[in-house]
Each structure stands twice: as C-alpha cells, then as structure tokens.
Regions:
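Structured aminoacyl-transfer and RNA-binding surfaces used for tRNA recognition/handling
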Residues: 5-228
Length: 228
C-alpha cells in the first residue's frame, strides 16, 4: 500500500507546488513558541483579559461541553476515582467561558482568556484542521448598551492590532520572513458578499474578496440571505 492508501487522502498534507520553508525545522518550532507567547501578551493587553485555567475534560451532566454543530461526538472515558463516572474531553469552551466569567466575578469591559486544548474526533482533516485543538480562547463581558456593530468592529481591530504587533516582532527575530498582514482590516457582511459575487459559492466569495482586500472580517454570518 502507498501512503495515501495506508492513512487515507484526508490525512495527507497538501503543499503548493512552489512551497519552500524559509526556516529550518528547529527554527520553525522556536518561531511557533514565540508567536504564541507574543500574541498572548498583546491580546490580553488590547482586550483587557485575564488568563485563567480551563478544563481538559468535564462531566456530561454539567452541560459545560460545547457541542459545536450538535452532531460531533465527544471523546468519553470513565474515571476510577469518581466511581467509574463518565467524563468528556472538551470540544469547545463556549459554554464554560460564560460560566467562568460569572464564577470569577468579571465586570463589563473585562474578560478572560485561556489556552484551550481539545479533541474533536469528527473533525474534517486538512492543512488547517486537526482532531487536536490548541488555541487561545477568550470571552469578554459587554454591557447591553454596547452590544452593537461598532463595538464588534472595535474588538476586531484590536485583535488585528495584536496580530500585527506579533508579526512585527516575528520579523525582527527572523529577518528572512516578510510582512504579510496589511495595516488595516476591512469589513463586509455576508449579504454584501453575496451581492458582490452572486455567481460564486460562499467559500469562493470569501476567497475572492480576501485576495482583493488582503485582510477582511465577514460580519452577520449565520442569518438568512436574500437568495434563501
């Protein structure tokens, strides 16, 4: 059997034909760690976030495991010390973060972030998606009067600023790398995308507009479009 037959096509990494890594394998690992550290500091400062520890697994009856689209199966196991009661590896911290904001007595304008580790057994695998998730996850309390488009855009700009700050430090540490992010991020709604590119699929619209603008935030995702 060849590699594709042994592990299946979904497990293979796909590289552009002209791809060539600018860093050695070792420097790539150093850069990954540096990016994670620098972005953590910048994100916390920009959004006024406090780091908290998150669970790796929870009991099903707590209702704190995020169920994503509602069809993904969590990884489950029993714990001897709990009388063989069942636990689930977290798939999402969406519910837990809201619980934690209340538990730790956060106030409007404040928030938390955590180093989320999760296992998603039903994830569709490709270059960007893995069954193992390791990501910075955050949540903030927004006063009801501030829950509007301008607040959303403000948060996006702050996150993008943190990304730019991280990129700047990365290039200083590894001069062989080049600037990738534009100075500003642009905004567009999903309906505006459909109006601009009616002949394309939703994914194609995103790709075309991202290539055109360089850095985009798509808003109002999930609501019905005029096309139905």
């Amino acid at each position: 059997l060849n590699a594709a037959e042994r592990i299946g096509p979904a497990m293979l990494s796909i590289y552009p034909k002209q791809y060539r890594s600018l860093l050695s394998v070792r420097d790539t690992q150093v850069a990954i760690k540096a990016i994670k550290d620098w972005f953590e500091v910048s994100l916390a400062q920009e959004l006024n976030l406090t780091r908290v520890s998150a669970p790796l697994f929870v009991r099903p009856e707590t209702g704190l495991n995020g169920n994503l689209n509602g069809v993904e199966r969590p990884v489950t196991f029993t714990v001897k010390g709990l009388g063989e009661r069942q636990c689930e590896v977290v798939q999402s911290l969406a519910k837990w973060k809201r619980f934690a904001l209340k538990k730790y007595s956060f106030h409007p304008g404040e928030g938390l972030y955590t180093d989320m580790n999760a296992v998603r057994r039903d994830e569709e695998l490709d270059n960007l998606h893995s069954i193992y998730v390791d990501q910075w996850d955050w949540e903030a309390i927004i006063d009801r009067k501030d829950r509007n488009l301008w607040t959303l855009m403000g948060y996006v700009r702050k996150i993008y600023k943190a990304l730019k700050q991280t990129e700047r430090r990365l290039i200083q540490a590894f001069p062989v790398l080049e600037t990738y992010l534009l100075d500003r991020i642009s905004f567009i709604t999903s309906q505006e995308l459909e109006d601009a590119y009616p002949e394309l699929t939703p994914r194609e619209r995103e790709n075309v507009h991202a290539r055109k603008k360089g850095a985009i935030c798509i808003m109002q995702i999930g609501g019905p479009l005029r096309s139905g």
